[in-house]
Amino acid sequence: MSDYKSTLNLPETGFPMRGDLAKREPGMLARWTDDDLYGIIRAAKKGKKTFILHDGPPYANGSIHIGHSVNKILKDIIVKSKGLSGYDSPYVPGWDCHGLPIELKVEQEYGKPGEKFTAAEFRAKCREYAATQVDGQRKDFIRLGVLGDWSHPYLTMDFKTEANIIRALGKIIGNGHLHKGAKPVHWCVDCRSALAEAEVEYYDKTSPSIDVAFQAVDQDALKAKFAVSNVNGPISLVIWTTTPWTLPANRAISIAPDFDYALVQIDGQAVILAKDLVESVMQRIGVTDYTILGTVKGAELELLRFTHPFMGFDVPAILGDHVTLDAGTGAVHTAPGHGPDDYVIGQKYGLETANPVGPDGTYLPGTYPTLDGVNVFKANDIVVALLQEKGALLHVEKMQHSYPCCWRHKTPIIFRATPQWFVSMDQKGLRAQSLKEIKGVQWIPDWGQARIESMVANRPDWCISRQRTWGVPMSLFVHKDTEELHPRTLELMEEVAKRVEVDGIQAWWDLDAKEILGDEADQYVKVPDTLDVWFDSGSTHSSVVDVRPEFAGHAADMYLEGSDQHRGWFMSSLMISTAMKGKAPYRQVLTHGFTVDGQGRKMSKSIGNTVSPQDVMNKLGADILRLWVASTDYTGEMAVSDEILKRAADSYRRIRNTARFLLANLNGFDPAKDMVKPEEMVVLDRWAVGCAKAAQEDILKAYEAYDFHEVVQRLMRFCSVEMGSFYLDIIKDRQYTAKADSVARRSCQTALYHIAEALVRWMAPILSFTADEVWGYLPGEREKYVFTGEWYEGLFGLADSEAMNDAFWDELLKVRGEVNKVIEQARADKKVGGSLEAAVTLYAEPELAAKLTALGDELRFVLLTSGATVADYNDAPADAQQSEVLKGLKVALSKAEGEKCPRCWHYTQDVGKVAEHAEICGRCVSNVAGDGEKRKFA
């Protein structure tokens, strides 16, 4: 028997079947670094229209977690897809390097500044620590396959950036947005510093819930207001609070002007409550026998005075819109030094902003004899006992409620009035302008707009000063007596910035005021405060984007971070940019959800459900992690687990196998010599290229809309359905058995070449390592890297006017599906072994029959059977299978007649008819020794 294997065009490629990504990717990274791939891309894209994705700086502390990976991979997908779309899209990664977490780490190792080290030495240690953290995180980010200017990232602790942060503050001051005030701010007693809103988290806390009676100073005036004379006992206005420790700072009681307030007689006294809350308060304080003596509007009680239960002074009733009927008594204890609403209304009524609490959270001397020096949270019980002793406590119980806590220490924080510097939201219209700017930004998902609008509309002034060691100095001089800013503040700040640009922030602390103030130095003091770390990152649109040469003066197109950044970086950047320039710093803002485990639970080391990106990369490879990120809808929570990553690996194998099939069948194909013109190609091959064209249109639209899970779904559909289960199956016969250089085979290879050229580019932004690997095996002259080019433009399709157009082949796909069902049943019934043992008769109604007949003898190749005939639908025998999909089709199957050709495996009746090749069929004889078969359709 002759060996005809050598006459077949069997697929062959060096592209491995197994990805072995964990082992192979590091070598690719080394090549990318050695070649300076990022630099090559920049050179290739020079002069193109720009797209700038400005990197929100992660904090330089600790190893990267799965959330970091999601963020950096999404950014990389966008930057690479923009490059392929014809943009110059430089990516400059950055790090946030100042602030409390780094101070705490350095304190743990070396002690607080001033203990073992000077403040200057402490700052140097902080700088060293931040630099080591940057290096560690950078290695992991690079390992993810993220391309960027890793050799020249921006660090908020770079001297030039520190100087530019000072300049940004100067611009804001010049535009009139800064003011100083003793104002209640979030204060962490462990940090001993003010906290930004973004540094506050909420946890459940148990607090005493108390109802307290403030006795009226002028009882008769109150009786007159309520038009009553017979009142048994004193009259009191009752407040409810869960922060008894703030009562020493009480300076008023707020009531609502339009609420009805009732005078209620209870045993031995009368109390004033919001009428709608009387019943619930009576239940709470355990009173069943009570009488409502009269009601008045809250406005009637304004400025009536009530005695503080233990502080020895009286306070007014004032009117406030912040009073609600949700809980309590309808009368709100008001301490302007301990709450933003209290402060605002206190300003309106000229109340004292009293703050009896020191930075360590203990009462200052002279507050009250039994409270001086006591921690405020320990003072709650003392205050409750005091109220009980004075007969002012109507009720006390423990209550669990959501309470603000420090993001770093996880401990409860307080509102505390301290002298601080603020960016005003309203004195120069910053709030109104910011709200206007928000409307001009594209928010992705679109609910982000309403979220940030609500935050901007309701946020207080931004406290930007901090009492810390490791941070950018505010660089201000204030008059010793008046505390007014120096009249030449902007000029002086620029002088400081120039010094910081050379020597870093230490230049400010080393600066002798005489050096720049001369004779005025003894009249002014240096402000010791540093800037809120959110000011550092929030000003990078100015300190980084505006000055980096690769951005060429262009503003950022996109900011992309987790959804917590609406109140964080998106907010601080918007505030600073609008205050400086009157406009938003971004054109688009994209947010992604948080990572959760496979059951939707928050990731937690204590639960043990965290997924380490380093482990995933070491086990499965970065491309699997990248594919998981891309295939997950980032607009909601992003679930990740070993099982979910395993599914991503399965999807990866499908894509890799498709790429390998294409490469293996392009063996021996030189596009410069072997390409077949579209008009000379087999129709099915043109259809396949058209499928790629349609897929590319969908994929590019999805990339443009940042719908990466749609990209992956469309890519998978193309690989699995249009290619895997149809086209690639059909062409194997022609590809393997036709003459090597025949039009029939070269047509097929031409289609595969076009498809591979497109596919490798679709993959590149997501499966960057695999795309680079595929690129190296593609035939033909090309640039060294897929990332320097653009989307493939060589695709074409069938015209709608052609008889065998896309609609024709769509119907053929359905016919093929119906035939497969019949074959599968026959195999199950042991009638045939494989599809080539079968011959089918398609009983079709005239319109479908005409289409099937048009393929002639090539119909069998489409159906993967050894025989295929078309007959009239009405002639179908009883055992023909009615199609459920195509009403005008019935399928009958029989065993194929003739012998099996050992070369093509088809059963035919002309096997052995040619003496010289007695074992093979006539078609194979033609392909081996003759002119080769001609294919027109399939």
UniProtKB/Swiss-Prot annotation:
Positions carrying N6-acetyllysine: K183
Motif stretch ('HIGH' region): 58-68
Binding locations of L-isoleucyl-5'-AMP: E561
Enzyme Commission code: 6.1.1.5
Binding annotation for ATP: K605
Record GO cellular component, one term: cytosol
Motif mapping: 'KMSKS' region: 602-606
InterPro entries cross-referenced by the UniProt entry: aa-tRNA-synth_I_CS, aa-tRNA-synth_Ia, Anticodon_Ile_BEm, Ile-tRNA-ligase, Ile-tRNA-ligase_type1, Ile-tRNA_ligase, M/V/L/I-tRNA-synth_anticd-bd, Rossmann-like_a/b/a_fold
Pfam family, one: zf-FPG_IleRS
GO molecular function, one term: tRNA binding
Cofactor binding, note field: Binds 1 zinc ion per subunit.
Cofactor(s) for this UniProt protein: Zn(2+)
Gene3D superfamilies, alphabetized: 1.10.730.20, HUPs, Valyl/Leucyl/Isoleucyl-tRNA synthetase, editing domain
Locations listed in the record: Cytoplasm
Family that this chain belongs to: Belongs to the class-I aminoacyl-tRNA synthetase family. IleS type 1 subfamily.
Physiological role: Catalyzes the attachment of isoleucine to tRNA(Ile). As IleRS can inadvertently accommodate and process structurally similar amino acids such as valine, to avoid such errors it has two additional distinct tRNA(Ile)-dependent editing activities. One activity is designated as 'pretransfer' editing and involves the hydrolysis of activated Val-AMP. The other activity is designated 'posttransfer' editing and involves deacylation of mischarged Val-tRNA(Ile).
UniProt comment concerning the protein's domains: IleRS has two distinct active sites: one for aminoacylation and one for editing. The misactivated valine is translocated from the active site to the editing site, which sterically excludes the correctly activated isoleucine. The single editing site contains two valyl binding pockets, one specific for each substrate (Val-AMP or Val-tRNA(Ile)).
Record-linked HAMAP family: Ile_tRNA_synth_type1 (MF_02002)
Oligomeric and partner information: Monomer.
Protein name in UniProt: Isoleucine--tRNA ligase
Species the sequence originates in: Escherichia coli O139:H28 (strain E24377A / ETEC)
Lineage, opening ranks: Bacteria, Pseudomonadati, Pseudomonadota, Gammaproteobacteria, Enterobacterales
